[in-house]
Amino acid sequence: DFNRKNKWRKRGISLIPVKYGSGYNIVLLEQAAAVVVVNPSDGSIIIHQGGVEIGQGLATQAQQVGAYVLGIPMEMIYMSNANTSVIPNPTSTGGSTGTPYACEAVKQTCEQMRSRIMDFGYKLLKDKGEKWCKDHGIDFWNYGTGEGKGWATVVKDSNCNEAMIWQNLTNLAATNRI
């Protein structure tokens, strides 16, 4: 119907065979790794990942993934340049294929960290009680609006110090060697 109504513009279907894909198509070679380090004094994060930033936005994307998974502001996340003394050699970055690999590695690492920190927080709540947790700045409820920002919620501890729940939890986790 569109083609009959338009003399010069036409719609059609095209099939294009592709001989060469992107990447190696060998799982062994298409891997990435990430290390996430928490600074216990302020809760800031340093992400080491093997991808090389060559203008494709890898560092920004990995930073966004880490912030989203951990539920903390991007300003608290710092990206480290690729360094083989921390992370093994990555897959190639050609055609921006290294970016999704590196971001997936960051995602999985941050998910593991989030799980460990959450388990630690719930263990504190169970073992120490609600009052102890609230006094130490681990309070998951925002009383002002009834909604929280997760770990980015700013709370006061028993000394009226303001900090994010994330900062309080990571400090306690470091103290307890979690």
Regions found by a protein language model. Name each.
Residues 73-78:
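Short acidic capping loops at alpha-helix termini that bridge into adjacent secondary structure
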